[in-house]
Amino acid sequence: MPELNIAIDAMGGDNGPSIVIEALEKAVHRYPDVKFTVVGHEQQLTPLLDKFNLSSHPSINLVHAEQVIEMDDKPGQSLRSKPESSMRVALQSLTDGNCQAMVSGGNTGALMTNAYFTLKTLPGVLRPALMTALPNQTGGKSYLLDLGANASCDSETLFQFGVMGAVAAEYLSGVPAPKISLLNMGEEDIKGNDVVRNAAARLAQCEQLNYIGFIEGNHLFSGRADVVVCDGFVGNVALKSCEGLATFIIDQMRDTLNSHWLYRFFFRFLQKRTHKSWDRLKPDHYNGASLIGLRHVVIKSHGSASAGAFYSAIQQAVAEAHEQLPERIKHRVEAVLSEQL
């Protein structure tokens, strides 16, 4: 396998390039054999690279990009009016073969539009999907897709999401024969609309997939399924609801702990003994949604990500590039489609 080179859109996100460069400092030490192409405005990035002693680092190549896609830019407008944006230049490095993966914390709609235009989908893939990993009660991860790339989907698209998600679970988490479910309003076969029921029939008929039926939202974190499939509208609402609930619980715990010194004492006592469990639940560890179904690896970081969270997105990019995930998805989709002939 050729040496990995990861393109970093340093200008995307709400917190500016300083967060990206701070994350990059950690990444170059964690992955000494990986190269990083940092794309953005040279005058802004050079002082930051100097600050973190990365200016002359052999693993880093700085590429100037004159334009920046803002968080409020319309996707179509960004595609037409900003061909020299840091996001587009980073994506183009994949097409040119200079890099094997790209990470951006920029405008989600713009990233999806520019990635789709620049990279194209894999042969046979109808639509790309946004996918993320969720912690589950078994100690592993469950992969949820789509998270918003496609507000509505037909049954064949949902079927393909199941195929792609299974490849991700198999090669990124080492799960043999990943269990696939469709997110639905009930577990009975009669529940859901025609699109979901038809997708269920397609998944059940495919001998190469381990489809286990419908799953409800309250079992997303149970580990019952390794891959949970839904359209982008449902997936986005489900994910944002989970994030909102987590924030609410953390805020409530913080208010309670601050109300009395004794609560803080016992919390510190428990925290030392449950460190691994708490650490596994930190949202920063799960930052980085994969835009799968494209010809190259594209990772979307939260726009408001901390340096630690952006580092997790870089880790995701390295893992997918190392496993050559797009190529594996391509072969699996081809095999599944040939089975249907």
Swiss-Prot record:
<keyword id="KW-1208">Phospholipid metabolism</keyword>
<comment type="function">
    <text>Catalyzes the reversible formation of acyl-phosphate (acyl-PO(4)) from acyl-[acyl-carrier-protein] (acyl-ACP). This enzyme utilizes acyl-ACP as fatty acyl donor, but not acyl-CoA.</text>
</comment>
<comment type="pathway">
    <text>Lipid metabolism; phospholipid metabolism.</text>
</comment>
<dbReference type="InterPro" id="IPR003664">
    <property type="entry name" value="FA_synthesis"/>
</dbReference>
<dbReference type="GO" id="GO:0006633">
    <property type="term" value="P:fatty acid biosynthetic process"/>
</dbReference>
<comment type="subunit">
    <text>Homodimer. Probably interacts with PlsY.</text>
</comment>
<keyword id="KW-0444">Lipid biosynthesis</keyword>
<dbReference type="GO" id="GO:0008654">
    <property type="term" value="P:phospholipid biosynthetic process"/>
</dbReference>
<keyword id="KW-0594">Phospholipid biosynthesis</keyword>
<comment type="similarity">
    <text>Belongs to the PlsX family.</text>
</comment>
<keyword id="KW-0808">Transferase</keyword>
<protein>
    <recommendedName>
        <fullName>Phosphate acyltransferase</fullName>
        <ecNumber>2.3.1.274</ecNumber>
    </recommendedName>
</protein>
<keyword id="KW-0443">Lipid metabolism</keyword>
<dbReference type="Pfam" id="PF02504">
    <property type="entry name" value="FA_synthesis"/>
</dbReference>
<keyword id="KW-0963">Cytoplasm</keyword>
<dbReference type="GO" id="GO:0043811">
    <property type="term" value="F:phosphate:acyl-[acyl carrier protein] acyltransferase activity"/>
</dbReference>
<dbReference type="GO" id="GO:0005737">
    <property type="term" value="C:cytoplasm"/>
</dbReference>
<dbReference type="InterPro" id="IPR012281">
    <property type="entry name" value="Phospholipid_synth_PlsX-like"/>
</dbReference>
